[in-house]
UniProtKB/Swiss-Prot annotation:
Probably part of the adaptor protein complex 5 (AP-5) a tetramer composed of AP5B1, AP5M1, AP5S1 and AP5Z1. Interacts with ZFYVE26 and SPG11. It comes from the Eukaryota. As part of AP-5, a probable fifth adaptor protein complex it may be involved in endosomal transport. InterPro entries: AP5Z1, AP5Z1_ARM, ARM-type_fold, TPR_AP5Z1_C, TPR_AP5Z1_N. The gene is Ap5z1. Keywords: Cytoplasm, DNA damage, DNA repair, Nucleus, Protein transport, Transport. This is AP-5 complex subunit zeta-1. Pfam families: SPG48 (PF14764), TPR_AP5Z1 (PF25153), TPR_AP5Z1_C (PF25154). It is found in: Cytoplasm; Nucleus. GO terms for cellular component: AP-5 adaptor complex; cytoplasm; late endosome; lysosome; nuclear speck; nucleus. SUPFAM superfamilies: ARM repeat. Disulfide bonds: none annotated.
Length: 807
């Protein structure tokens, strides 16, 4: 989120027109030809804002672009101007008028700026190879007074990411050697301050030793967690080298366990020889890549030891936690490339896991720790269930409000789906209530991740409980909000906190009467049971309009679609029946978030039809429940879309064609119930406090009644009479006060169409209950047997015999 002032500046930058931009470029061109000053800096800052504020590239005058390149390459140009020029040129890339070259740049700082612009071109003219060759030429210089490599390491990391295959074998070995030097042999004395001042004495300028985060004097080599007032150049390079270490190991390591660089150590995994090899004292004689792995392992072990110290400053404590995550990730890479590191790593990681449970704030390290045990747990013969349980259950319940943790945990699950065995998948499925807490609190950024994850979470044992949980997701968001606020003191809550204005929500959260429902809603694992949360829906109604709850509600329809797409792939008949009943039950039991009910009803109604298509016999098997559902007028007014689909499904699938158990008695029961309902919503006077019945429901009821009558032909005169009345009623001007003109016309048209078909009962039965062969493409491609042709022929015959039946 930007401040109002920043938003205003961005808006102005986006709205600037080409003519105004041309005039501004002329001013920038003039300033770049003069001596640099504050006006030049200000103009370049404004130009950078203009070119970076829009998604499409801005076109600048050629002279302006040429001067930007000239200023960037001039050794005498102030550093601030060079940085701004490089930033503007990067935003404009790629473009054809680039005249930069990294071959003649006088210093590494300027080379890093020029190289950043060249890499932004996208390797159109071999820029990446040119940049990498120039950097490696500098790396070959081992003179202490040589140019500083610190500005080049970010560029080198970018080169590795853009084109990892561009480096030659000798370049790979050279960089591995340099990384060994930078990581292992940085100075352990603090650097000198930039200026000691006129009155400083030699004693005050003498550098002191590097210290640990707890203030103790460092007794081992320098790392990124070493502290001091000032750092030397090689110490800064040490920090940057660690930041690119994992990327370089992944690039330079063996492509597979059988490659020569691995020395076939995968075959020795678990053997005494592997352990002896790992403990070898001749590591300095190893090839460059293996030597780098040894040094990287030592560096990470040192970081794990340093992270166990109690930091004196909060900034150092935060850095400890970040380095812990990276160190475990690097160790994972090392053990994958060389299994001889595995047994030296396990003991320290087991100790780390015990410590993570005691050290609040270090939970992020659980994700790489779980990844490590997932990759190596079987080889190490270690049961990592405690790590997985803490990651999938404890962490979401305690840290659901951390967006970073939420993304990392869910990304871990989606990224490793192919690696999960049946035991882990079972643990994952049982943990879905905890994972849903991340989703409920961070629904906009995590919705796409959960769409990928849901198929792995759904099985026959969790499907019903999970569907309840998805429908109650906005309610879970409100409950998590209250859980978080209940741990705060009144003075810690913000003035806009809704719980201050509606204290009943917090009181209900602490009320023993609702504790059981809240415990069920906030459970950490699947319980195998369901609870009706209607009392909570009413109690938490004041929070239904909260922004976070509304955002969560908007994600539910997408998640429901993903859920049904997954569950319908494997659901058996019993589960389909359960899901169909659940849809009917929950369609009138949703948390009252604005527009939530309508969106969810749209998904539920469409998915009910999918379930019926998968198992048409469910209409007969659930006839009692469906009769109860369609027997109430309230179902029409509260859930019209679901009701319409239920009525359609009855007309489509209540037939001997789909289920031999279907009887005439069942057809008559449904006919009488729907006939009475249609009479009630059309013939009786509508109540003032109830909306009128939608025309879509009326036409669906008429169609279903006609379908049922075509299957029990003694009902045809009865439905024909009713349809005649409906047609007359729709033509009555008084109907316009109940339905719109379009709605009344649709009712009249449908009644006329149905009456026409009923005049020839055998044809009506063929149309409304076609044999299975009609679904074959032949009926739609062959003009001699096409169904539309048959209907047109019947229509002409009926028109000639209009007096055959009353109507």
């Amino acid at each position: 989120m930007f401040s109002a002032g920043a938003e205003s500046l961005l808006h102005q930058a986006r709205e600037i027109q080409d003519e105004e931009l041309r005039r501004f470029c002329s001013r920038v061109t003039k300033l770049l030809q003069e001596a640099p000053g504050p006006a030049t800096v200000d103009a370049l800052q404004r130009l950078f804002l203009i070119v970076s504020a829009t998604k499409y590239p801005r076109r600048l005058e050629k002279m302006c672009v040429d001067l930007l390149q000239t200023t960037l390459c001039l050794p005498a140009s102030p550093e601030q101007l060079q940085v701004l020029c490089a930033a503007i040129l990067r935003e404009m890339s790629p473009f054809n008028d680039l005249a930069l070259s990294c071959d003649h740049t006088p210093n590494t700082r300027q080379l890093s700026l020029v190289a950043s612009v060249l890499l932004a071109q996208g390797d159109r003219k071999g820029e990446i190879r040119c940049v990498s060759q120039r950097i490696f030429k500098i790396l070959e210089n081992r003179q202490p007074e040589g140019p500083s490599v610190r500005p080049l390491l970010p560029i080198l990391s970018k080169v590795i990411g853009l084109a990892p295959g561009i480096l030659m074998e000798d370049q790979t070995n050279l960089l591995s050697k340099r990384l060994v030097d930078w990581l292992r042999y940085a100075s352990i004395q603090q650097g000198l301050p930039y200026s000691g001042g006129f009155f400083s004495t030699p004693r005050t300028r003498q550098p002191g030793p590097i210290t640990e985060v707890d203030g103790a004097v460092a007794s081992d080599f320098f790392t990124v967690l070493s502290t001091g007032q000032h750092f030397t150049e090689d110490q800064w390079v040490n920090m940057q080298a660690f930041s690119m270490l994992r990327k370089w190991l992944l690039h330079s390591g063996p492509e597979d366990p059988c490659s020569p660089d691995a020395d076939d150590k995968s075959e020795l995994e678990g053997s005494t020889l592997s352990v002896l090899s790992a403990a070898s004292t001749a590591s300095r004689l190893l090839p460059p890549r293996e030597r780098l792995r040894e040094v990287a392992f030592e560096y990470c072990q040192r970081l794990l030891e340093q992270s166990n110290r109690r930091a004196l400053r909060k900034g150092d404590s935060d850095l400890q936690k970040a380095c812990l995550v990276e160190a475990v990730s690097v160790l994972d890479v090392l053990c994958r490339q060389d299994p001889s590191f595995l047994y030296r790593t396990l003991s320290c990681l087991k100790a780390l896991h015990r410590r993570l449970g005691e050290d609040p704030g270090s939970e992020r390290a659980l994700v790489p720790l779980a990844q490590f045990f997932l990759n190596h747990g079987e080889a190490a013969a270690m049961d990592a269930e405690a790590v997985y349980g803490q990651l999938l259950r404890g962490l979401p319940s305690e840290r659901f409000h951390s967006p970073t943790l939420a993304f990392e945990v869910i990304h871990f699950c989606t990224h490793n789906l192919a690696l999960f065995d049946s035991h882990f998948l079972s643990l994952l499925r049982l943990s879905f209530p905890s994972l849903f807490k991340f989703l409920a609190w961070n629904s906009p950024p995590l919705t796409a991740e959960f769409v990928v994850l849901l198929p792995a979470l759904v099985d026959a044992g969790t499907a019903v409980e999970m569907l309840h949980a998805l429908l109650d997701l906005p309610c879970l968001t409100a409950a998590l909000d209250l859980q978080l606020r209940s741990t705060q003191t009144p003075s810690e809550r913000l003035l806009w906190d809704i719980s201050l204005r509606v204290p009943s929500c917090l009181e209900a959260f602490q009320d023993p009467q609702f504790q059981g429902l809240f415990r069920h809603l906030l459970r950490t694992k699947a319980s195998g049971s369901t609870e009706r949360l209607t009392p909570l829906h009413q109690v938490l109604k004041p929070m239904a309009s909260c922004a976070r709850v509304t955002q969560c509600a908007e994600a539910v329809p997408v998640l429901l679609q993903a859920f049904f797409s997954a569950v319908t792939q494997t659901a058996d008949g019993a589960l389909i029946n359960q899901l169909a009943l659940l849809l009917l039950e929950r369609s009138d039991s949703l948390y009252p978030v604005p527009q939530y009910e309508a969106r969810v009803h749209g998904v539920l109604s469409s998915q009910l039809l999918v379930l019926c298509k998968l198992k048409p016999s469910l209409v007969v098997e659930l006839s009692r429940e469906l009769l109860e559902f369609v027997g109430s007028v309230s179902s029409i007014h509260s859930r019209a879309s679901v009701f319409t689909c239920v009525v359609w499904a009855i007309g489509e699938y209540l037939s001997v064609t789909w289920d031999k158990r279907c009887t005439a008695e069942q057809i008559n029961k449904f006919f009488e119930a729907l006939e009475a309902l249609l009479f009630e919503v059309t013939q009786s006077r509508p109540l003032a406090d109830l909306p009128c019945c939608p025309p879509e429901v009326v036409t669906a009821l008429m169609t279903t009644l006609t379908k049922l009558a075509s299957r029990s032909q003694d009902l045809i005169p009865r439905v024909s009479l009713f349809l005649s009345k409906m047609r007359t009623l729709a033509q009555n001007p008084a109907t316009s006060s109940v339905h719109s003109e379009e709605g009344a016309e649709s009712i009249r048209t449908r009644a006329s169409e149905l009456l026409t078909l009923l005049k020839m009962p055998s044809v009506a039965q063929f149309v409304f209950t076609p044999p299975a062969g009609v679904c074959q493409p032949r009926y739609h491609r062959d003009t001699n047997v096409a169904l539309p042709l048959a209907l047109r022929t019947v229509s002409r015959l009926v028109e000639k015999e209009a007096g055959l039946l009353p109507g």
